[in-house]
Amino acid sequence: MKTTYVNATIVTMNEQNEVIENGYIIVENDQIIDVKSGKFANDFEVDEVIDMKGKWVLPGLVNTHTHVVMSLLRGIGDDMLLQPWLETRIWPLESQFTPQIAVASTELGLLEMVKSGTTSFSDMFNPIGVDQDAIMETVSRSGMRAAVSRTLFSFGTKDDEKKAIEEAEKYVKRYYNESGMLTTMVAPHSPYTCSTELLEECARIAVENQTMVHIHLSETEREVRDIEAQYGKRPVEYAASCGLFKRPTVIAHGVVLNDDERAFLAENDVRVAHNPNSNLKLGSGIANVKAMLEAGIKVGIATDSVASNNNLDMFEEMRIATLLQKGIHQDATALPVETALTLATKGAAEVIGMKQTGSLEIGKCADFITIDPSNKPHLQPADEVLSHLVYAASGKDISDVIINGKHVVWNGECKTLDEERIIFEASRYKRGLQR
């Protein structure tokens, strides 16, 4: 099946960050086979021609760190620091989850993400009360591209920890798929919730199965102080001593890093998922993304969970990310719009090991989203496309979402998930949680 999308303004995110006015994209099944400017001449003898009527077409956004199973917990525990927020609000509520609640919560997060333009994401879920196969089936049904990882903790007894490791290893062996729509990573929660033995076992599983690692690291000053007091090393050095960085690793946050640590992360192919809104809301601080990029670290933008954000709008994250860097460095050139867009598209895709997506180029997966600026005053005049995407647009502006060549959202309507049922069930299950 060959489909051509014509009369589009195409934000390619190729090496030149080329924006093609009045162009077209040809998709064959799940792959882009041509991207050009001008009028389509039907040289490829396509099956369908779709008129985009001047819409902006850009790569689907890539969210490098989420917790979609937590989506029911939006608005719970506002205005709290990370540790008490986790210990007194989030973990007690997650302990009440059932497989049905977990699926309903996941569906809500998936619906919000895909309708706001996210096509790929990397996720960590707490396995308590969760049917992991049901979660993976739910993500698959959404049509999204994802790395969904089972989180490991050292809570409970040593036998509990051993069982958690065994279950996580089975999960990795079942779901790791380097080139598929769904894959997974090895995901120890953090150095402050995992024992040294557990972190070492996670490193072993990652090496033996050739997977990536996903972990919260260097998120707060308290974490750095506590880990240094307990192990005599800062979190980066401690994680490295456990062997975690033997495989490409994504660290969520990286707020508290020094110059030596940034250089070390770059040398060891450790990537950073930058969560600006969540870090601000939890009072964790502001990650120095400018310094990370200058050190050669791969960085991708992320939302974290709705419980700490409180939405999954990647456009908002792009805007906050660039404004924060300009502010903390007192440098208006810090993190320009092209870089912000890169960190939410092709750069983010590279961070989570999904190089097959993130730009609109021949040979890439047909993952793209559209915005119609014609009826949106906040996107007018419409000629400064890149600027508007970062500084003016929001996820609410999305018209269409195509993932792997399939229309997942069309004219604002999600085709893969039942929006009315999902919203109803989310409210019903939320009321049943004992706060």
Swiss-Prot record:
Reaction catalyzed: S-adenosyl-L-homocysteine + H2O + H(+) = S-inosyl-L-homocysteine + NH4(+); S-methyl-5'-thioadenosine + H2O + H(+) = S-methyl-5'-thioinosine + NH4(+)
Family: Belongs to the metallo-dependent hydrolases superfamily. MTA/SAH deaminase family.
Cofactor binding, note field: Binds 1 zinc ion per subunit.
Residues at which substrate binds: 94, 150, 189, 219, 304
Name of this protein: 5-methylthioadenosine/S-adenosylhomocysteine deaminase
CDD domains assigned: ATZ_TRZ_like
Intrachain disulfide bonds: none
Residues that coordinate or bind Zn(2+): 65, 67, 216, 304
